[in-house]
Structures are given as structure tokens and as C-alpha cells.
A protein has these predicted regions:
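N-terminal secretion-targeting helices of virulence/extracellular proteins
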Residues: 1-90
Length: 90
């Protein structure tokens, strides 16, 4: 017998919070990238090169997270709807 072991409303709230978080993260990343670009005009030693590579790698990882979690949000909302439909049938 199938069971619903999640509160659909909690799932919806999480999906909405994830969407907000992704938006905030994208805005922060854009701002930080602009500041880092400006910093590159005055910081040009070996440490800058090392940090720039780490920074770039981290930004790529964060972009992949945002892409993945942006796909998960709608999935979670559909799942919440299916669970709610299932619970109404009981």
C-alpha cells in the first residue's frame, strides 16, 4: 500500500524558498563578479591568479547548483500536487 510521507504544503514552501534563494544567489553572484572584475584592475599578483581560478571554479559550481535546483522547484510543486490529490482520495 502506497503512503504519502510528506506534507505537501511543506514541500510547496520549500520549493518557493528554494526559488527565492536562487534569485538572491544569482543577484549576489552578479554583484560579486562585478566587484571582482573591478578588483582585477588593481590586484595583479600570483595570489590574484590563484584566487581568480578558485573564484571562477566556485562560480561555475554555484551556477550548476542554480540550474539544477531551478529544475527541482517545479518538480517539487508537481509532487506536492500529486500527494495532495492522493491524500484527498483516501
Amino acid at each position: 500500500m502506497a503512503k504519502a510521507i510528506v506534507d505537501p504544503e511543506e514541500l510547496r514552501r520549500f520549493a518557493e524558498e528554494l526559488k527565492r534563494f536562487n534569485g538572491d544567489l544569482q543577484n549576489s553572484m552578479s554583484s560579486l563578479q562585478a566587484r571582482f572584475g573591478a578588483l582585477s584592475d588593481t590586484w595583479q599578483d600570483q595570489e590574484h591568479l590563484k584566487f581568480a581560478q578558485d573564484f571562477t571554479d566556485t562560480m561555475k559550481t554555484l551556477r550548476r547548483f542554480i540550474e539544477s535546483s531551478n529544475q527541482q522547484g517545479p518538480f517539487l510543486l508537481r509532487k506536492a500536487q500529486r500527494i495532495e490529490d492522493y491524500l484527498r482520495q483516501r
